[in-house]
Regions:
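Short Gly/aromatic-enriched secondary-structure transition segments
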Residues: 59-71
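Bacterial N-terminal signal peptides that target proteins for export
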Residues: 1-11
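Short, surface-exposed binding/anchoring microloops in extracellular/periplasmic proteins
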Residues: 45
């Protein structure tokens, strides 16, 4: 059997890929970074990708697609329909007639209040009770500043995590 001819160019390209670390398992996607802080528990929300991660000791345990405030990010005043950015503690998850389960986020922080930020009743919840097409719950940003999961099961999973872990909310 005759070995197929391989061009010098192909060999050099293969060597360059090996030298760059390819071929040693799957490469990380360009720009990948671990979404979780190295220690502790956190619910990390990334506005750019519309993803929420449940994190424990630097390891993501769940990834959930979310919708955000229709006014964008960077809440500063009540009624601006923006989702706040920063680190927050959680209140106790509770039943909600409108959303099933509501997980309060302690916004604004004392520092934000000192800077004049206003707003209240922000948190994580599922789709509204009256929506027929829950698949649309994360298709676009529709909330008045909250973070919305696509299903009741997802918000319940977040609520259990908040009750069990007492995590920090990190929103960016």
């Amino acid at each position: 059997m005759v070995a197929p001819a391989v061009s010098t160019r192909a060999v050099l390209a293969a060597l360059a890929l090996l030298a760059a670390g390819f071929g040693e398992g799957p490469p990380d996607p360009a720009g990948y970074r671990n979404p979780c802080p190295a220690t502790g528990s956190a619910v990390a929300v990334f506005s750019r990708t519309h993803e929420l991660y449940l994190c424990r000791e630097g390891v993501p345990h769940a990834r959930i697609r979310v919708a955000l405030g229709r006014g964008g990010m960077g809440k500063r005043r009540a009624g601006d329909k923006k989702t706040p950015v920063g680190s927050y503690s959680f209140g106790e998850p509770r039943a909600s007639a409108r959303y099933g389960t509501f997980i309060p986020i302690d916004y604004p922080t004392a520092e934000q209040t000192a800077l004049g930020y206003t707003g209240r009743d922000l948190g994580i919840h599922g789709p509204p009770r009256n929506w027929k097409d829950v698949a649309a719950a994360t298709a676009l940003d529709w909330t008045t500043g909250c973070i919305a999961t696509g299903t009741d099961e997802e918000v319940e999973r977040v609520a259990r995590f908040v009750r069990d872990e007492r995590p920090l909310a990190i929103i960016e």
